[in-house]
Amino acid sequence: MAPPPGVGPASLRFAAAASWLVVRRRRVEHFPKVVEFLQSLRAAAPGLVCYRHHERLCMSLKAKVVVELILQARPWDQVLNALKHHFPAESRTTKEDRKLLEARENFCLLVKHLSEDPPSSLQELEQDYGESFLVAMEKLLFEYLCQLEKALPPVRAQELQDALSWSQPGSFITSSVALHQYGMDMGWTFPESSTSGSGNLIEPMEESPHQQTRPAFHSPLPKAKLGPHQPASLEHPEHLAGHRFNLAPLGKRKSRSHWTSAKACHKERPTVMLLPFRNMGLPAQDLSNPKSREEPGAASAASVGTEPVCTEEAKTPSRPLGKRALEETPPDSPAASRRTV
């Protein structure tokens, strides 16, 4: 899935289209190939997305691969070997970010605890790493690929055809399922003159009234359109990748849950949640105490009249109000002249 040398933007788009189709169709067995493509893309263009966005996406793909082996009841030796392969002990990828390092360590701890004391049911694990987890991952990938499309030159059908002929002689871009799906989700359009008689790769689609009234998914692509076959991650535009959506359970959770092991005993589950990373500027005590999240005005209003006000005048003996007023009034002021009359 890595781009072939010397082909250029078209090869990147083919690799991106293949990765996008793999994630959209939930082909977990091919997730490692998607990780390889993202790592090669990161090495070539590190400025497409931030470091945390890239690492969150790669960690999610790797975690799903390991979890899928557990759900398939593979031998624990195979699961632990996959864990060691995808999350090596001496990994420098997460040392730049404490949250990512914590998420990585806690996930490895979870898998090791499960191998030592397998639970009687994997329903909770399947739910945590189920469709909601995949939808959140799909959003991260979509935003990543949108940034890639912004960095690449405009799409040209002939360049795509040349790249496809280089890798698969005799094939045509109009028959590429991955490229067609990717083009629809990215909103590709081709002028009539650029197709050289091969026909438009992406035909314009009329939007239904429901699609016209629905808010558009925020995308860096100015011309991106959502067709009737849009991915599941684009059906909820209010949850944007990289903002506040839940990418559980790759980071620390606030709630405590337990696994029921096969030995009929309870064991604390070392779950973690990756998002949200930041506490929106609130102190740690504000997050744990709901009362402390009240409006600042309410707290200040309640404190009026209850806290002593320390001033320098409070240290001096009390004086009559009239005398003190005369002392504080400048001699040449109008108020002073009226008092002397």
Swiss-Prot record:
A GO cellular component term found in this entry reads: nucleoplasm
One Gene Ontology term of the biological-process aspect is:
negative regulation of telomere maintenance
- So which residues are the signal peptide here? none
Keywords from the named record: Acetylation, Chromosome, Nucleus, Telomere
InterPro entries assigned? TINF2, TINF2_N
Subcellular localization(s) per the UniProt record: Nucleus; Chromosome, Telomere
**Which Pfam families does the record cross-reference, listed alphabetically?**
TINF2_N (PF14973)
Motif Nuclear localization signal per UniProt: ranges: 249-255
Q: Which GO terms describe its molecular function?
A: telomeric DNA binding
Write out the residue ranges of the motif TBM.
243-265
Q: Which residue stretches belong to region Disordered? A: 283-341
Q: Which residues carry this modification: N-acetylalanine?
A: A2
**Oligomeric form and interacting partners:** Monomer. Found in a complex with POT1; TERF1 and TNKS1. Component of the shelterin complex (telosome) composed of TERF1, TERF2, TINF2, TERF2IP, ACD and POT1. Interacts with TERF1.
For domains, the record's comment is: The TBM domain mediates interaction with TERF1.
According to its UniProt entry, the function of this protein is described as: Component of the shelterin complex (telosome) that is involved in the regulation of telomere length and protection. Shelterin associates with arrays of double-stranded TTAGGG repeats added by telomerase and protects chromosome ends; without its protective activity, telomeres are no longer hidden from the DNA damage surveillance and chromosome ends are inappropriately processed by DNA repair pathways. Plays a role in shelterin complex assembly.
What's the protein called, per UniProt? Answer: TERF1-interacting nuclear factor 2
Species whose genome carries this gene:
Mus musculus
Q: What phylogenetic lineage does the species belong to? A: Eukaryota, Metazoa, Chordata, Craniata, Vertebrata
